[in-house]
Amino acid sequence: MRKYFFFDIDGTLTTPLTADYPDSTRETIRQLQAQGHFVSLATGRIQADATEVARELEIPALVSDGGNAVTVEGEILYHEGLPLPLCYRLFADTDWKKHPWAITTENRKYRITSTAGYLEKVKDRYYETEIIPGYDYRKAEKIYKIFIACTRKESEEIPLHGLPSVWFREDTLLIEPVHKERGIFEIMKKYHLTDEQIVVFGDGMNDCSMFRKEWMTVAMGNGKAPLKEKAKYITKNADEDGIYEACRHFGWI
């Protein structure tokens, strides 16, 4: 039976500390496709960022933006942003002098903030950050991500109004979609798949929604404990050939 594999990127395909792709992981992806299986990413990264990874690993499909986008063979099937009414409520009800913000409004690693205070509070520079004084977020056609500079304790003061969130870093709460299973369902619909054909790999809390009982779920050894509890199989760490080990164990390669 042809299987359809969905891999998280960070901490699953990449090693947790160095963010490298182990040689065994690259070879496993190659062998899976050589055996006739379908391989896709399933990541919270924005579509353009995930596309770079897909090209490097020669993966033909990607569920990106936490399930808010699906791309197959270079064609974007859909790419949605966060619900704007909820974003507007968040902006209206939060003390932004205390918790500076930045938003991603384009399909690239780029974010806009209205104050220099954001870059003073956060350390990461993974996204290009432009400071536009007086920027009006309501002019954005789409908002893909909202970065909020705060600690875990301070995050209790932020009214999310049902918006999904993950921790980007210890100093940054990231508002982004966390329903990767939605993208998997879209691919299942496109190819008329059964639940028995789906295999998902992950390590983080934003992978929980795609660890469904009807699918084959593999957690990395370095994964979060709640995810491991949902998994049908726990493999070795990402930096200990965990992807290869699981695929060999089940005879997929």
Q: Which residue stretches match the model-derived regions?
A:
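Asp-based phosphoryl-transfer active-site loop
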Residues: 3-18, 211
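Short, structured coil segments at secondary-structure junctions
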Residues: 57-58, 66, 159-163, 213-214, ...
